[in-house]
Amino acid sequence: KDKQIKRKQEEKRMSLFIEEEGNIKLDFDTEEIAALVIDAALELADCPYEAEINLLLTENAQIHEMNLEQRGIDRPTDVLSFPMIEYEEPGDFSVIDEESAEAFNPESGELMLGDIVISKEKVLSQAEEYGHLPKREYAFLIAHSMLHLFGYDHMVDEERVVMEAKQKEIMEKVGIFR
């Protein structure tokens, strides 16, 4: 398993910037799991670019504030996704061309996909609620959010079914099961 993770990091499809707030700690390597899931998502989406993703691990109070500010929903949530790209069709990277300078980091040349914010408290409580490990819940939330960064949504049943199938595919690829 460790060899698989090292190989993935050497192939490096992305830069991952992680910031952590608060006192709650998750008892696994959050960076390693995030990199593994993000890499699998990029591969399955057939992303033609090296990508940049920002990940903020926070607590309920902070994500509650962001959820209210960004979505008008007055409660904490498990994950928020802030895509940088507007796709015509989910996962269709053809809307981006080399001329779309604002889509790429001028220093690294990487495609700036967007930001993911995860509540560590929700990772722990939902893992307990659903009867699986926090590592699995965290990986699932990263997979879910990556699909939002690719333009997928789950507001209507048809989109939800597609998104759920893709989430399952990502989770199977990284080998993290319920």
Give a label for each model feature:
Residues 1-139, 147-178:
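An acidic/histidine-cluster motif and surrounding catalytic segment
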